[in-house]
Amino acid sequence: MAVNVRDYIAENYGLFINGEFVKGSSDETIEVTNPATGETLSHITRAKDKDVDHAVEVAQEAFESWSLTSKSERAQMLRDIGDKLMAQKDKIAMIETLNNGKPIRETTAIDIPFAARHFHYFASVIETEEGTVNDIDKDTMSIVRHEPIGVVGAVVAWNFPMLLAAWKIAPAIAAGNTIVIQPSSSTPLSLLEVAKIFQEVLPKGVVNILTGKGSESGNAIFNHDGVDKLSFTGSTDVGYQVAEAAAKHLVPATLELGGKSANIILDDANLDLAVEGIQLGILFNQGEVCSAGSRLLVHEKIYDQLVPRLQEAFSNIKVGDPQDEATQMGSQTGKDQLDKIQSYIDVAKESDAQILAGGHRLTENGLDKGFFFEPTLIAVPDNHHKLAQEEIFGPVLTVIKVKDDQEAIDIANDSKYGLAGGVFSQNITRALNIAKAVRTGRIWINTYNQVPEGAPFGGYKKSGIGRETYKGALSNYQQVKNIYIDTSNALKGLY
């Protein structure tokens, strides 16, 4: 299937600052391609430090009036954004598929609708938020106010470009902040098109979108003296740098980072549910998911029954043209990611691991121009293996046999990460006990990779700081002010 790219994507994009697309301070651009075909989609402006200065200055100016708008006004604008996203769902989903390589069935059903739902959700959250008043005694009163922080600086990863942007933008502007956000230089196009919705709905300067390299303009955003709050989704290595910038400037940071999550299949699991859940955990979005269930821990009693079913299921996955509605897995997002995946396959071949399914790049039937990889299942002898400890970020699943629930818990916790995990069991008490014992921010029971609004998402340990996607995330973008009132009109007698 082929579409006319220019029906969806402009040939060039400027920076979105103060409600307009503008030229950058430099004429440098970055080529943006379709990872499934190698086709050039567009050229984006390569922002420099001067552009970051401009965007932050505009955001600071806009904050003065935006922070004073009523909650109901902000809520209505967020709802309008969500409505317009849904009205343009098919177009924006196609842009996401063209730019990211993920299947159109996912962008149409998940990425764009869930982005829209986040704007609707945080409209309701801010509209129903209430402060508190505490009567300390008959003469004194404590009022607690939640106030916006100021200018938010955000950078989001390439795996869910529009959805992750919504996770940042919706709560930030709902709380009364303004934002300067930068998408990945490889997948910026959906957010740039959605800027046209912001242009229609929001006052100028509330949302500003820069494009460029993370090591250049992204770093400049995080180290800018005019930025009051940092928010980042990406690798743990870069997360350390963002945390250092936050510490240096003494500003708060929300970090959603890497993971090596364990998906635990107990001996009483419904195997039909488990097979589907395992695939949801590692094949959804080509495995390019921070919460991917990339370590499969299988009870020894059902190991020999489950593994052949997985081998068959993996071999039947349709990998191909992301624009085809029947495609279940599309292209990896770029050559660097494909090379990284291949490097771990090489490690498996040179070690005592056993490749049970997949393990190859796909190049037949017109796939040679893209970065397609087979669903891959690898048995490793224990959790100390390199493939069981490091985040691969692709459709590569390591499987480890466990003898009981406690061993599953111990192995699940034997990781520097703590983002997510899963448990499959028909005994809810047993599943809950494991869920409580595993040190991660999210545990799914009898499903995987469901991330709706209204349920907190974020990690323990090296997987990040803070939570997103639920009402408590609003506090990430607020400061608490206490107004303490003495109505006694009486001297205290100390001086």
From Swiss-Prot:
CDD domains: ALDH_StaphAldA1. Keywords: NAD, Oxidoreductase. It holds the Pfam family Aldedh. GO terms for molecular function: aldehyde dehydrogenase (NAD+) activity. Disulfide bonds: none annotated. It catalyses: an aldehyde + NAD(+) + H2O = a carboxylate + NADH + 2 H(+). The keyword Oxidoreductase applies. The keyword Oxidoreductase applies. The active site is at E256, C290. Belongs to the aldehyde dehydrogenase family. This is Putative aldehyde dehydrogenase AldA. The lineage of its organism: Bacteria, Bacillati, Bacillota, Bacilli, Bacillales.
